[in-house]
Swiss-Prot record:
Native source organism of the sequence: Haemophilus influenzae (strain PittEE)
PANTHER family hit by this protein: TRIOSEPHOSPHATE ISOMERASE
Gene Ontology cellular-component annotations: cytosol
Catalysed reaction equations from the record: D-glyceraldehyde 3-phosphate = dihydroxyacetone phosphate
The protein's name: Triosephosphate isomerase
Amino acid sequence: MARRPLVMGNWKLNGSKAFTKELIEGLKAELHDVTGCDVAIAPPVMYLGTAEAALSGCGCNCGGKSVIQLGAQNVDINVKGAFTGDISTEMLKDFGAKYIIIGHSERRTYHKESDEFVAKKFGALKEAGLVPVLCIGESEAENEAGKTEEVCARQIDAVINALGVEAFNGAVIAYEPIWAIGTGKSATPAQAQAVHAFIRGHIAAKSQAVAEQVIIQYGGSVNDANAAELFTQPDIDGALVGGASLKAPAFAVIVKAAAAAKN
């Protein structure tokens, strides 16, 4: 089946109110006529309100609804209560966020988030009607030891074991080899395709229908120079973009490359 690509910008710990407004104005100008590719941005949660306001009334022929959708970089498993500093699914929905990143290697590393905890976040998002963007991927040591497939399977199975394979209906997986994040290194298109094909095949062993529709993004130092070649691969359905998402022209090139390659 034809899968509609998704290119999502993960701003990480970057930005300000002024930066958020300026970048979104640039993105709206660059992307107002793009079709055939879903686009999302995940600013820091402090700036979701600023981003929501900046995205409204985009000035194109879409009836006031921007082609760019809001996302977020994290969520908690609790809906409310005494959980200082955490953000709930309902809070994210209140700002119009749709695509929520979970399991990013930086969360797994710096905040010690386990596969099982990430799976609970996945379940909380599904219950709230939000779209999980599940990040998976191996470290450099695991890659060199030939454990890429083992690691990816384990991280996917944590969700399947907790929620069933059908939980991946309408969900997104982002393969992000840790050794390629923010390093300037990137898997070759063939290397990335091999892992994406494995991920889809691993899910297909449980359900072919679920595997065929799940969006699998690549997320390792994607930029305006390497995106087009990555998107020629049949199992790469878009990108989770870090540094390049902070510059409107570069991010727009990536979005347009996905739209051109997949349509």
